[in-house]
């Protein structure tokens, strides 16, 4: 169909070309054509004309024609002539391009021929590609099959190679196991042997193989030989631990740990021999450490300084001697029984190295038992930490530690239990309780739990003993013989000083611990000493002496408690209240002693309201003797009061506080007297005998710099 169309088009183009050659003049032909008026135009229907006019109303061309006044028919003829001219021009242009169109037709026909040939060629290519695709698919299937077979062969080769490697026994391995020395190479060979033994035991398929039947006897012989050889080697190393002056930790770290794989090998392939090695190590270390601790304890015992006996109690009379008690030394030589003093340093030095006994003995030094206790347990902690970590690393067992330390624990208990049962040093016992607390914290920070149960046991044994000794002090106060304790001396009693130092010691030791049970015991002790000191005070014949005795003891107690810390707590507050109340009583006693009439008048008469009972109004005759008596001897009385206070109170500052309080109270009494005189008719007559308040204030300042 395309060929026919192209040929027809070519023929048409040829005709146009021939016409052009013949000089065919279309213009002349067309030029004779003319539009004639339609004879029937008058009969044209006007239907729809209005609509067409409305549509053309907005047309710009029509509007221009109408506005110019031209006739539509003439304008239409002009347009028709223009169209004819354009048509003729187009035909001429088409005729001019006829040769090009013929040439284009020839080119299209050539292209069509070429495309036809290409179509034939591509069809052949398509058939060949289809054939090649089929061949490629076949090759791909063959390749996948060959890849799978190769993979299977490689897997088989790998397993077979591993099997051969795991099951064969190289001659070099036999030489090393049988004849080699136990060293790093030997342990590497043991690892290889271990892998072979595990391989044989783990795989059921291997056990049924014929190859194993040839190799298994040789592997068993090597296993037995290796076990025998490493057992002898380890035993020799364990024997070295028993040699005197051997540094066990260095031997463990630098020698035994290098061969810890031997233990792993024995545990896996020689269980019975491993248990023998384990038992041998436990027995060796048990005996070695027990001997070390026993020797250390014996050396420490030579350094012990006895602090207290069963008779060193707060309420026991210092001069008491008996058949089974020694003469008592003065308190100043035995202050460590009741006062903490420098013993608190043991808490600050809690993590210092353990004592070296022979150095201390050479220096002739003696220590309270808590120092030896700390040193012993410091050595125990360090030794236990090292041994626990070694056992875990070397044997892979933590439980072995407890079997080893059963001996050392027993040795320490044999020493500590008799010491504890004969310990009457309450401060020392509390220090040991605090030491154990700090040691538990140290072991916790180290993350070593091996001493938890032992330290708990020691702590549990210390508390009942402390309670018993503390109760002995409490009983000594409750059951004290006041007749033998009493001394005709208003200065602080030695029992009260003991109590103050004893209590201050425990307050100091409880600052960072907040032990409620200890606070309760101290309160019980305070109540007991309160009762005792009041009983002793009542033995003084004069009330003033009783009060002075109580003030001196309370003041001394407060001073000692303040040394223990800035806040003495409820106990200090209690004694401060007691001091305050007794100071007020003493001031009254002192003033009554020198100004009894003045005080009696102020208390009885100055407070009366004369308006209610005019008959009992205060008169000049009643107050005049008081004024003259005060004016004649008030300075002398103050001097006597000052001397009395200085001789009565051992604490100068306390005496000055009391004197200041007494003079202040005297000034108040005298001021009330002068106020009464001002209210009496004619009282101004006594003004010349009255001592001015300024004079009294001036005199008071002479005796009190802090007034």
Swiss-Prot record:
Subcellular location: Golgi apparatus, trans-Golgi network membrane; Endosome membrane; Golgi apparatus membrane
Keyword Coiled coil: yes
Assembly with partners or alone: Component of the Golgi-associated retrograde protein (GARP) complex, composed by VPS52, VPS53 and VPS54. Interacts directly with VPS53. Binds to VPS51.
Physiological role: Acts as a component of the GARP complex that is involved in retrograde transport from early and late endosomes to the trans-Golgi network (TGN). The GARP complex facilitates tethering as well as SNARE complex assembly at the Golgi. Required for pollen tube elongation and other polar growth.
Domain of life, per lineage: Eukaryota
Protein name: Vacuolar protein sorting-associated protein 52 A
The encoding gene: VPS52
GO biological process, one term: protein transport
InterPro entries linked to this entry: Vps52, Vps52_C, Vps52_CC
Tissue: Mostly expressed in roots and flower buds, and, at low levels, in seeds, whole inflorescence and mature flowers. Also detected in pollen. Present in pollen, buds, leaves, and roots (at protein level).
Keyword Membrane applies: yes
Coiled-coil positions: 181-203
Major location (coarse): Golgi
Organism in which the protein naturally occurs: Arabidopsis thaliana (Mouse-ear cress)
Stated family: Belongs to the VPS52 family.
Topology within the bilayer: Peripheral membrane protein
């Amino acid at each position: 169909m395309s060929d026919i169309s192209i040929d027809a088009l070519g023929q048409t183009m040829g005709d146009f070309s021939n016409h052009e050659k013949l000089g065919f003049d279309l213009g002349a032909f067309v030029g004779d054509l003319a539009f004639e008026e339609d004879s029937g135009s008058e009969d044209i229907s006007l239907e729809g004309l209005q609509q067409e006019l409305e549509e053309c109303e907005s047309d710009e061309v029509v509007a221009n024609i109408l506005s110019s006044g031209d006739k539509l028919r003439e304008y239409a003829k002009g347009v028709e002539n223009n169209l004819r001219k354009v048509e003729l021009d187009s035909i001429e242009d088409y005729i001019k391009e006829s040769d090009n169109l013929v040439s284009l037709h020839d080119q299209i026909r050539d292209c069509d021929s070429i495309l036809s040939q290409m179509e034939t060629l591509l069809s052949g290519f398509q058939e060949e590609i289809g054939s090649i695709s089929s061949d490629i698919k076949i090759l791909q299937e063959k390749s996948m099959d060959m890849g799978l077979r190769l993979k299977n062969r490689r897997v088989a080769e790998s397993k077979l190679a591993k099997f051969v490697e795991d099951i064969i026994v190289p001659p070099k391995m036999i030489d090393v196991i049988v004849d080699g020395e136990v060293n790093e190479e030997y342990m590497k060979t043991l690892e290889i042997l271990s892998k072979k033994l595990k391989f044989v035991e783990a795989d059921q398929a291997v056990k049924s193989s014929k190859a194993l039947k040839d190799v298994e006897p040789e592997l068993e012989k090597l296993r037995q030989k290796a076990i025998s050889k490493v057992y002898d080697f380890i035993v020799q190393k364990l024997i070295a631990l028993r040699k005197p002056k051997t540094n066990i930790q260095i031997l463990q770290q630098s020698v035994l740990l290098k061969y810890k794989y031997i233990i792993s090998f024995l545990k896996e392939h020689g269980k019975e021999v491993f248990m023998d090695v384990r038992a041998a190590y436990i027995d060796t270390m048990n005996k070695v450490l027990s001997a070390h601790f026993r020797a250390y304890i014996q050396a420490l015992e030579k350094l012990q300084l006895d602090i207290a006996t069963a008779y060193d109690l707060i309420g026991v009379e210092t001069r008491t001697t008996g058949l089974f008690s020694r003469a008592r030394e003065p308190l100043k030589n035995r202050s460590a029984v009741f006062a903490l003093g420098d013993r608190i340093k043991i808490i600050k030095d809690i993590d210092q190295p353990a004592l070296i006994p022979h150095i201390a003995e050479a220096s002739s030094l003696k220590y309270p038992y808590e120092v030896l206790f700390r040193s012993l347990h410091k050595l125990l902690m360090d030794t236990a930490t090292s041994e626990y970590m070694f056992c875990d690393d070397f044997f892979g067992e933590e439980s072995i530690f407890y079997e080893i330390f059963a001996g050392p624990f027993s040795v320490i208990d044999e020493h500590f239990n008799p010491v504890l049962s004969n310990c009457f040093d309450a401060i020392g016992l509390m220090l040991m309780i605090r030491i154990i607390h700090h040691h538990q914290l140290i072991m916790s920070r180290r993350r070593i739990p091996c001493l938890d149960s032992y330290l708990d046991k020691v702590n549990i044994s210390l508390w009942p003993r402390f309670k018993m000794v503390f109760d002995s002090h409490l009983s000594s106060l409750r059951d004290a013989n006041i007749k033998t304790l009493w001394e005709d001396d208003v200065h602080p009693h030695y029992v009260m000083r003991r109590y103050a130092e004893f209590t201050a010691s425990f307050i100091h030791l409880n600052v960072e611990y907040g032990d409620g049970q200890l606070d309760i015991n101290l309160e019980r002790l305070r109540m007991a000493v309160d009762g005792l000191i009041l009983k002793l005070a009542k033995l003084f014949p004069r009330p003033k002496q009783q009060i002075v005795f109580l003030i001196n003891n309370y003041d001394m107690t407060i001073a000692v408690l303040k040394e223990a810390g800035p806040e003495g707590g409820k106990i200090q507050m209690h004694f401060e209240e007691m001091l305050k109340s007794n100071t007020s009583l003493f001031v009254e006693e002192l003033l009554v002693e020198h100004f009894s009439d003045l005080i009696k008048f102020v208390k009885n008469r100055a407070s009366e309201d004369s308006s209610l009972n005019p008959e009992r109004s205060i008169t000049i005759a009643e107050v005049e003797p008081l004024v003259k008596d005060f004016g004649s001897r008030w300075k002398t009385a103050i001097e006597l009061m000052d001397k009395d206070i200085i001789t009565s109170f051992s604490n100068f500052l306390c005496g000055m506080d009391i004197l200041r309080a007494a003079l202040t109270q005297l000034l108040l009494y005298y001021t009330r007297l002068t106020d009464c005189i001002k209210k009496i008719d004619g009282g101004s007559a006594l003004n010349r005998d009255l001592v001015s308040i300024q004079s009294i204030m001036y005199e008071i300042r002479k005796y009190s710099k802090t007034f």
